[in-house]
């Protein structure tokens, strides 16, 4: 089986599926693009096409928080109530670190009452939602539960501590330093994104149709960044050479002894003694994967503007390739 076929096994659902793929391993490079930025246009996807990163965005939020920590403006142990005094009292037990590694137990904003006709929620709406809560799912720090709410709150903390908008902060303190000059933080209805891919779904006849937004796709902290293959290649090279990365890649043991392989915006696993760092993204009409390994001299980036694709499968396909099980 060829490498492309192995990596994309159970990932490509139709010949018209839009995607951009980059794979590098020890001098071998595979690059491939397919499809249109929108089913409504004739514009082809390229390596400069900007896709919504979905949860891959969390790396950039975490990186920004680590910046502020290294500048001694906050610490990993800063409790959230000391930043937002109008949040419920239980936030005095939740730290920056708990938000970063998903051990806070705060409620999922996706469980808010809503209808498809409601306006899209913004990050500030999630802060207001948290003010109405009175408990967590579990005792803080005792379990891992992936939390989009936590990363929205982290994005708001970046704004509050830096006294800059999240888009201004990331574009000046992360994107520019990494050379990612075409990447954007999307403020819905405001930001103009060049070369933008729009999300799609498949109908019952397996035909593409545009489905790019829904009620919770306008938030920033949990998934509102846009980038391309070419810019994400720059990000990988930049990230691994920063002191922030040392903090971000570290996994944790939580208080019940369970191993938490989620660091700070990055998941870390070990394959045959080699560390692999990655994050997947999943939102309406779009799925993403950013994966790299210093040990293996490897990088894999996959962006598709077709929803309903589990990019964890591609990560598992890669592991099979590494283990020689093909």
Describe these PLM feature segments.
Residues 20-22, 98-100, 299-303:
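Structural recognition of the beta-strand scaffold that forms the well-ordered cores
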Residues 19-23, 267, 290:
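Short beta-strand scaffold segments in enzyme catalytic cores
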Residues 91-282:
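Short, surface-exposed loop or secondary-structure junction motifs
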Residues 5, 27, 52-77, 154-159, ...:
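Active-site SXXK
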Residues 30, 278-279, 288-306:
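Short, well-ordered beta-strand elements
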Residues 2-51, 73-75, 132:
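Short, conserved catalytic-motif segment at the N-terminal edge
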């Amino acid at each position: 089986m060829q490498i492309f076929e192995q990596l994309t096994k159970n990932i490509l659902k139709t010949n018209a599926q839009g995607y951009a793929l980059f794979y590098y391993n020890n001098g071998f490079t595979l690059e491939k693009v397919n499809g249109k930025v929108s089913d409504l246009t004739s514009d082809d996807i390229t390596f400069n096409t900007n896709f919504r990163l979905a949860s891959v965005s969390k790396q950039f939020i975490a990186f920004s928080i680590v910046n502020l920590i290294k500048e001694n403006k906050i610490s990993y142990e800063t409790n959230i109530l000391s930043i937002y005094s109008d949040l419920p009292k239980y936030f005095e037990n939740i730290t920056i670190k708990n938000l970063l590694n998903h051990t806070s137990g705060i409620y999922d904003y996706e469980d808010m009452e809503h209808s498809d006709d409601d306006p899209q929620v913004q990050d500030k709406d999630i802060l207001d939602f948290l003010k109405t809560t009175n408990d967590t799912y579990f005792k803080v720090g005792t379990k891992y539960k992936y939390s989009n709410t936590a990363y929205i709150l982290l994005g708001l903390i970046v704004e509050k501590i830096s006294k800059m908008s999240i888009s201004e902060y990331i574009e000046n303190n992360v994107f520019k330093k990494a050379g990612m000059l075409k990447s954007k933080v999307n403020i819905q209805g405001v930001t103009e994104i060049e070369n933008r891919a729009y999300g799609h779904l498949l109908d019952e006849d397996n035909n593409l149709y545009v489905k790019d937004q829904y009620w919770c796709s306008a938030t920033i902290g949990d998934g509102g960044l846009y980038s391309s293959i070419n810019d994400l290649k720059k990000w990988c090279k930049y990230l691994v050479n920063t002191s922030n990365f040392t903090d971000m890649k570290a996994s944790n043991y939580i208080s019940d002894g369970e191993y938490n392989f989620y660091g700070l915006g990055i998941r870390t696993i070990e394959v045959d003694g080699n560390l692999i760092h990655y994050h997947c993204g999943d939102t309406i009409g779009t799925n993403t994967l950013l994966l790299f390994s210093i040990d293996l001299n490897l990088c894999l980036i996959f962006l598709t503007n077709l929803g309903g694709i589990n990019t964890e499968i591609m990560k598992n396909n890669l592991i099979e390739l590494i283990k020689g099980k093909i």
